[in-house]
């Protein structure tokens, strides 16, 4: 399906830019005059996209005028939005690209040309969610293979170059090489040599490997275990136009998006328009710090955009956040983020845009802004937007942006009034609500111990943690008896004795794009590590430390500035690029620590410079998890506890016994900025771009087919041609009635997408496990549903397989239901399979907020493949309802005030309904049951586009027919 041509209804607004480039653009301010001038900048971007894509069908003139009239229409109307591009990461990219591959098969079957099937929208796919930390300075457990590849092909492991001073722990124990206090403070040459040759152990052969090869070894294993998926991605990049794959080892999706993929202003056939992006990762919002409108959406919406269709959103309220003042020298971007997070959560910004303005905005660098924008999902906003200003232009110039294009960009943005002049506040937009935050009021802080919004000033950390021990179990409390709060447990580790207590730090990770995009906080961590090592401080060896950058850029400036060896000396060595500890892929703790935690029922702590700290996320046995800036992560690792007052208690002592306090080693802002200016330079950004464009040796040498149709491997348990198109006809058939449908499940309120399609591990007793076992896999090789999204057989069997699913037919939480013709209680999949063999259609009964939670495409695809024709609920989460329509399931809604109970429905009846020939949005339908009861429901379609998609049997069928 072709993308809409530019501005059918508004071609009269096309003008030529008044500069040497002579590019074309839509002069949208002409449309609205003073009404345009008071629109928030983010709404102006929505309006430009609407004007440019107005075709009278997918984007109507009424939609354009609704956006222009934002002040009165906000929160009341749905509007379509055509983003400029799409960003996928590998977990969600697999099902999207598998669907495209299957669509080629379907188009060929219908007699069309499969070579015509391409994404209409530029699509970038980054492979960043497959990294696991198999190698660091410790011996860890042999890891299962989550990607379908052969680990034996991951590359021969390097031999030991330097023997360890002490024997490592054996078996399942995880440990790190000793940090001899006598080594601290040595001359730089000897110091660097010692770090370079620190041995680690191969987790598969218990063979030591030299530390500098840590990253390479993790990447080797990553390519080995994910070979099957990577070959499919490479095929996709070869045969599909508009698809670019960023190979493993390059960086996280949103990090690469910021550093490499962002345009700020798009240029397409000499037409200029604002860059915008949607993607399948909630933290894609980072780019809003660069003045690029972007947010996360679900898999089906992403596929729709790739096929030239818009995403739909409620015209949002826009909260104006005025920043005033300047921050304290000891306050990092993370402190600013956590301060803003708490403030915005308190006032409530869920489902809203946040837009920053005020004198304080110019005090923030681009990396500060992107850090704040990246955290917006944690405080509930759709996005947090920083309009382009002089700071943005200076950043782009600094990073090597073409000067001629930069000048053209500035001219264009000023012409359409998308450039914010920080010297002139006379034309500030009007907002739904304005809040003020004085940057001077923000103090250094951390966030935790269980939620990112629970901010704690560092000065209050000790008293707050002690209060958490006292409080009842809840959002903050652990309810530890007073007489047990001072308990300690001794452990023997690497020949030394240590004591663990409540508050002991056992995981410390400098990780996540939240900080890796910000050189100042990363360099501050490195400088603090340098001063700590020079002062003779160390990190206790049982603490699991790691440094996982968002991209190679971070490695470059940490290395070139000379601070990387000091981080490594404290245990913070680079373990690889991608999501690791942040998403729970941390190496296991040692048995000594685990036993001590269990013995003393200790509340031990993880300290992470990421953006999520929900309980148990890092490790089940680590109950308290705190988000902190990178230098504070290093500081707490050195202290070994969060139960410390940095103002009055020392981190440790130097070799002479002198107390060393945090203020003794904390780098000044001037020091950090000096290092940043000297080492975060243009060459670094050029090197990153070259790395992406050239790929890497393993990716370049990876064999992949280049056939028009993908050669499906029938033995594969990861990638399979889905059955969505099995019954596809050249033309859509008339809407068929649903006759004598049985209820597959009778559910209550707040059924989440995780209840419907779990993403976690595959239970050994599940239908998916039986399928995998029959194909020769062991339970260790099952992996998770999330990793097998490219196999419809696994995902269909995993639908409604959540052990916490409460089906009223069963009366207790279990992934079971009743097959009424036989009376058997079966797994949901087994019952659905029987119904399909008997030719019986299915529906689902539900209460309020059906499909709430994270957007998940398989929460709609799975029920469809089970044979579900309709869902009848009291209310829906809108995104999930859109997904149901997009896959061909009718979303039916009880009349206001009615539900299954009030209508006397047991769910054991059969249900029949007929659709009118002219189905219209919100039409009332009559359902008749086998008991003779007749009641009315609402067909919950909101517009003509949704009805057209439903009549075609869903989005995929609609587009396949277009290509045919």
From Swiss-Prot:
GO terms for biological process: intracellular iron ion homeostasis. [4Fe-4S] cluster binds at residues 513, 579, 582. It is found in: Cytoplasm. PROSITE patterns: ACONITASE_1, ACONITASE_2. Keywords: 4Fe-4S, Cytoplasm, Iron, Iron-sulfur, Metal-binding, RNA-binding, Ubl conjugation. One of its GO terms (cellular component) is cytosol. GO terms for molecular function: 4 iron, 4 sulfur cluster binding; aconitate hydratase activity; iron-responsive element binding; metal ion binding. Ubiquitinated and degraded by the proteasome in presence of high level of iron and oxygen. Ubiquitinated by a SCF complex containing FBXL5. Upon iron and oxygen depletion FBXL5 is degraded, preventing ubiquitination and allowing its RNA-binding activity. Binds 1 [4Fe-4S] cluster per subunit. [4Fe-4S]-binding affects RNA-binding activity, thereby inhibiting activity of the protein. Its cofactor is [4Fe-4S] cluster. Interacts with RBCK1 only in iron-rich conditions. Interacts (when associated with the 4Fe-4S) with FBXL5. Interacts with CIAO1 and CIAO2A. RNA-binding protein that binds to iron-responsive elements (IRES), which are stem-loop structures found in the 5'-UTR of ferritin, and delta aminolevulinic acid synthase mRNAs, and in the 3'-UTR of transferrin receptor mRNA. Binding to the IRE element in ferritin results in the repression of its mRNA translation. Binding of the protein to the transferrin receptor mRNA inhibits the degradation of this otherwise rapidly degraded mRNA. Belongs to the aconitase/IPM isomerase family. This is Iron-responsive element-binding protein 2.
